[in-house]
From Swiss-Prot:
It catalyses: di-trans,octa-cis-undecaprenyl diphospho-N-acetyl-alpha-D-muramoyl-L-alanyl-D-glutamyl-meso-2,6-diaminopimeloyl-D-alanyl-D-alanine + UDP-N-acetyl-alpha-D-glucosamine = di-trans,octa-cis-undecaprenyl diphospho-[N-acetyl-alpha-D-glucosaminyl-(1->4)]-N-acetyl-alpha-D-muramoyl-L-alanyl-D-glutamyl-meso-2,6-diaminopimeloyl-D-alanyl-D-alanine + UDP + H(+). GO terms for biological process: carbohydrate metabolic process; cell division; cell wall organization; lipid glycosylation; peptidoglycan biosynthetic process; regulation of cell shape. It comes from the Bacteria. This is UDP-N-acetylglucosamine--N-acetylmuramyl-(pentapeptide) pyrophosphoryl-undecaprenol N-acetylglucosamine transferase. Pathway: Cell wall biogenesis; peptidoglycan biosynthesis. HAMAP family: MurG. Cell wall formation. Catalyzes the transfer of a GlcNAc subunit on undecaprenyl-pyrophosphoryl-MurNAc-pentapeptide (lipid intermediate I) to form undecaprenyl-pyrophosphoryl-MurNAc-(pentapeptide)GlcNAc (lipid intermediate II). One of its GO terms (molecular function) is undecaprenyldiphospho-muramoylpentapeptide beta-N-acetylglucosaminyltransferase activity. Belongs to the glycosyltransferase 28 family. MurG subfamily. CDD domains: GT28_MurG. It is found in: Cell inner membrane. It holds the Pfam family Glyco_tran_28_C.
């Protein structure tokens, strides 16, 4: 018989929602808890830290502006997910239920609230997502990755930060070195799952506009979602050394060795750039809900840790000018890298686990905030 206390974490079936849940699960297991995951079918290809016994798929759907029948179908799907969550909770008897965003987190968190279980949500972005926005009204505590400590829920918001991978923490130990003279210039480009195709077009156009000296210095590592072979040929024809692939297993290490990064501004990307401490040009994904990527990027830009340009304002000429500036101003790169690292939160996983244990122990939120998180927030 398993005498460990059970904690249930619920997350949408994408990497951005799942990763912080998995990171917390690893930490909580080390502290003696039995941790389960509730998610949807999409997660099967992402989940790495939960076995089948501890992974539970519930029915879920996303609200969209479409036909009334689709709306009815969505509501029925969520109701079904609530029933599945109710049966699971009666079986597991969790002492804590945490949500990490995405609609699959809504049914279990809503049922947990009705069952008077201790609950919290974790919001990775600077702007709260739709599911978390509703759940924020009812849960006991809100853990903020990039959230502002102010607002309607300030009294129950704890600034834990966003958990980062162990590989990122290891990469953060590598000091930043800005290249000088004729030294190679490592340029890392990644766009995540959203909008990487934009970079596949504009980056080679910008590289073609560089002068010969700076172009020869470039060492490009670029993540793409489309024709990797075609992009490799374009760079080869320009005489540029480049690695192009849909995915890099060692992305954290590549970030550590980058001299300049071009990226979208998803919460995990922004936090990893900050923890490792690398200068970056952030292009918020323009179709992100609630413009959360623009707000994420602004947090890093305000302290001088990154530059921001909207996609509509980024031309090949503009990017070429910024690349030229980066190649020729190593002191500015070092200043930006230092500013980014100062706001990194490498201990977010530990902070999140501390919060979870304090909630289980029945501690007052005011005490938790004062004793555990006031120092972390500064």
């Amino acid at each position: 018989m398993n005498d460990k206390k059970v904690i249930v974490l619920a997350a949408g079936g994408t990497g951005g929602h799942l990763f912080p849940a998995e990171a917390l699960a690893v930490e909580l297991r080390q502290r003696g808890y039995d941790v389960h995951l509730i998610t949807d079918e999409r997660a099967r290809s992402f989940v790495r830290r939960f076995d089948e016994e501890h992974t539970h798929i519930v029915s879920s759907a996303t609200f969209t502006r479409c036909h009334p029948f689709a709306l009815i179908k969505t509501i029925l799907s969520l109701l079904k997910g609530m029933g599945q969550s109710l049966r699971l909770f009666y079986k597991l008897r969790p002492v804590l239920v945490g949500g990490f965003g995405g609609y699959p987190s809504f049914p279990p968190l809503f049922i947990a609230v009705l069952m008077r279980r201790v609950t919290f949500i974790h919001e990775q972005n600077a702007v709260m997502g739709r599911a978390n926005r509703v759940l924020a009204i009812f849960v006991r505590a809100i853990a903020g990755g990039l959230l502002s400590p102010k607002g309607a829920y300030a009294h129950k918001t704890l600034l834990t930060g966003n958990p980062v991978r162990e590989a990122v923490l290891k990469a953060a130990e590598i000091p930043y070195h800005s290249p000088v003279g004729e030294e190679p210039f490592n340029f890392l480009v990644f766009g995540g799952s959203q909008g990487a195709s934009f970079f596949s077009h504009i980056v080679p156009e910008a590289v073609a506009l560089l002068d010969d000296q700076n172009r020869k210095r470039l060492r490009i590592v670029q993540q793409v979602r489309g024709d990797a072979a075609g992009l490799i040929k374009i760079y080869r024809d320009m005489g540029v050394q480049a690695e192009v692939a849909p995915f890099f297993d060692d992305m954290a290490e590549r970030m550590a060795h980058a001299h300049f990064i071009l990226s979208r501004a998803g919460a995990s990307s922004v936090c990893e750039i900050a923890v490792i401490g690398r200068p970056a040009l952030l292009i918020p994904y323009p179709y992100a809900l609630d413009y959360d990527q623009a707000e994420n990027a602004a947090l890093l830009a305000r302290v001088g840790g990154a530059q921001i340009i909207s996609e509509k304002d980024l031309s090949a000429q503009k990017l070429a000018a910024l690349l030229t500036q980066a190649c020729c101003a190593p002191h500015l790169l070092e200043k930006q890298a230092l500013a980014a690292k100062k706001v990194g939160q490498p201990y977010a996983t530990r902070c999140l686990a501390d919060m979870a244990e304090a909630l289980i122990a029945g501690r007052l939120l005011s005490d938790i905030k004062e004793e555990l998180f006031d120092e972390n927030a500064t």
